[in-house]
């Protein structure tokens, strides 16, 4: 079984999702493909996930890292599950702006992932990247479950 984690530079989120997954018997021997476009953040997550694999999973999973758009299809190839955790535009400045613009005009923005003005901004930034992901998934792992 293969799990590809898109946006693996989100270290805390990848640690939580993959760590929880490793706790399930069905996923002990899985292949984990960590994908990100930021080398430093990817390496940070890779070291953490590798350490977790050793400590809570007895090293049973195979953990690989894939950097950049040119390695995206390799990360996805043969995946059974694709977890998406990308943030186009980074927290600073984009997510901060997603909160500041509604506030400036007196609109309450409780969360900017999917709701309100901030959610619209985030969606507009993200949709073109997700379309690229979808094309690659259709080509190299058409039966994968995409979890956003």
Language model: regions and residue ranges:
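A structured beta-alpha segment of the ubiquitous adenosine-cofactor-binding alpha/beta core
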Residues: 55-80, 87-90, 109-115, 119, ...
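Short, solvent-exposed beta-strand-terminating loops
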Residues: 81-103
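N-terminal Rossmann-like dinucleotide-binding module
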Residues: 4-28
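Residues at the starts of beta-strands that form the adenosine-phosphate
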Residues: 2, 31, 62, 145
């Amino acid at each position: 079984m293969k799990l590809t984690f898109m946006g693996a530079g989100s270290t805390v989120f990848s640690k939580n999702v993959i760590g929880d997954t490793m706790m399930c018997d069905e996923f002990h021997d899985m292949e984990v493909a960590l994908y990100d476009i930021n080398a430093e953040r990817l390496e940070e997550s890779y070291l953490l996930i590798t350490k977790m694999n050793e400590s809570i999973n007895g090293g049973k999973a195979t953990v690989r890292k894939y950097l950049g758009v040119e390695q995206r299809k390799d990360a996805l190839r043969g995946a059974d599950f694709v977890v998406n955790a990308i943030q186009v535009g980074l927290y600073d400045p984009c997510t901060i702006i997603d909160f500041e613009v509604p506030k400036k005009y007196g609109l309450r923005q409780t969360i900017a992932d999917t709701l309100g003005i901030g959610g619209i901004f985030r969606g507009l930034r993200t949709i073109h990247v997700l379309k690229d992901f979808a094309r690659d998934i259709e080509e190299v792992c058409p039966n994968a479950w995409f979890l956003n």
